[in-house]
Amino acid sequence: FKMAIPIWLKEKLFQKDLLRKQFKKFDPDFDWMNKLLFSEHHFSHAASAFFPSPFEEACVLTMDGVGEWATTSVALGQGSKLEMTKEIHFPHSLGLLYSALTYYTGFRVNSGEYKVMGLAPYGEPKYADLIRDNLIDIKEDGSFRLDQKYFDYCTGLAMTNRHFDDLFGGPARTAEEL
């Protein structure tokens, strides 16, 4: 939590006010402060998956980089209700782990992940044990924790650090050109 505060203050704290001010430019007379509603990131993902589905009841798993604080969530959908039952919070994120690997292999974060996914079937799982043994602690209940000594994404400066480089045998590849 302490590591994430600088990024949260910069990126998230004033986001709602910023959006309301921008919308006010379009229609200054509309009551944006009271009419504009916000839902949590993972709740929105879960709702968009469950409500249009043909299922009356379902367990909905959402995993990505990070929403407000949640990175992984489990929701139970029943009829017209959706209840979040479990969450894993930042900085522990499979999405950010994937982005760190994307960064390390020389692709741009938030745009190169699909390339890594597309190349994955052509590779060998030679780093799977290394990742499981060092980067992630998978708990018996399926939850997980990332060992933060290998990552720098909490500072917003880089995805990985020298410990990550040492673990994988060298520095990250230079980012791809535009």
Please describe what each predicted stretch is.
Residues 1-178:
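Short acidic/glycine-rich loops and adjacent helix/strand connectors
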